[in-house]
Amino acid sequence: MLTDRQLLILRAIVDDYIKTAQPVGSRTLSKRSDVTFSSATIRNEMADLEEMGLIEKPHTSAGRIPSELGYRFYVDHLIRPESISPQEAKALKSLFAHSVNENDRLIRHTADLLSELTHYTTLVLGPKEEGQRLHHLELIPLAEGRVVIVLVTETGHVEHKTLQLAEALSREAASRLMERLNQTLRGTPLRQLRLRLLEEIRRFRSEHSEQTTLLSKALDIVLTDQHEERPLIYLGGKANMFDQPEFQDVAKLRPVLELIEQQEALFDFLSPSLDNQILITIGSENNVDALKDCSVIRAHYSVDGVSLGTLALIGPKRMDYNRGINSIIHLLQAFQTELRKNSLD
């Protein structure tokens, strides 16, 4: 159990190190207005904190820096909630002032804004479409037998593909087919949609001859492609990595960049859980070797209780946890509101 004095000194060390990236000594701490005891007392308390494994001494400095255990204690017990600045609140309001009814664009905007607010790299795992439901299908005939097929989910995600049919399809025929299909299939989970859709088209086939047969094949292709896609990972602020003193060492930065570029290894790491609370993992807690020098703040987003994806910040272990957590909390609320609007449109 730490004393009040030790708690104050540990918080001061972490706060100073986050701001300066320089080891913190007793002389530096003694100049702080909230530290009112002598340098000798500070040194004794720092020695105790080091013995507890909460701070450590870098090889090249007389000062101390937080250990992973120290950061964990700080995150769990010492963070003080802060509001975002008026300028940041204005930026959030501006981003969502005009409704963005395509989730892809909305997610990209969100990733970019979160990286601007925090100056860290942002990853957003997009919705896993197989867990969603159909809102409606659209069939738009074009010239020379071409047709655009559009699939819209209840969360506003849009998939579309242009296909070539052997015969031109009239707008009247397309409208009748889509009206019937949407009446029957609205709300169907995407993982069940392909079979349900083909069953409906078979029932409808006698009314539309060859065109419906071709259309069933086209829809089958669209839904098969869509169903097999993995969720997209949206990236914001990749260049922010280069601004961190820790990552001036290319050997530390390279594996992080390679992990982000590959993306495949990130799916399990970012996949939503049933717990919608913010999750903070520090260094070795990430269980991904490339992130051993990083901290990650994750929050899962949802619409009407359905978990859809993940917002994540990646930075050094020395990241500003207060700023990261508060930025995610405020952005998450606005982001989920826009997703919910899209699901109702």
From Swiss-Prot:
Database matches in Pfam families: HrcA
SUPFAM superfamilies listed in its UniProt record: GAF domain-like, Winged helix' DNA-binding domain
MF annotations from Gene Ontology: DNA binding
Superkingdom: Bacteria
Keywords: Repressor, Stress response, Transcription, Transcription regulation
Record carries keyword Metal-binding: no
GO biological process: negative regulation of DNA-templated transcription
Biological role: Negative regulator of class I heat shock genes (grpE-dnaK-dnaJ and groELS operons). Prevents heat-shock induction of these operons.
Family affiliation: Belongs to the HrcA family.
PANTHER family with a match to the protein in the record: HEAT-INDUCIBLE TRANSCRIPTION REPRESSOR HRCA
HAMAP family, A to Z: HrcA
NCBIfam families referenced in this protein's UniProt entry, alphabetically: hrcA
The protein, known as: Heat-inducible transcription repressor HrcA
Organism encoding this protein: Exiguobacterium sibiricum (strain DSM 17290 / CCUG 55495 / CIP 109462 / JCM 13490 / 255-15)
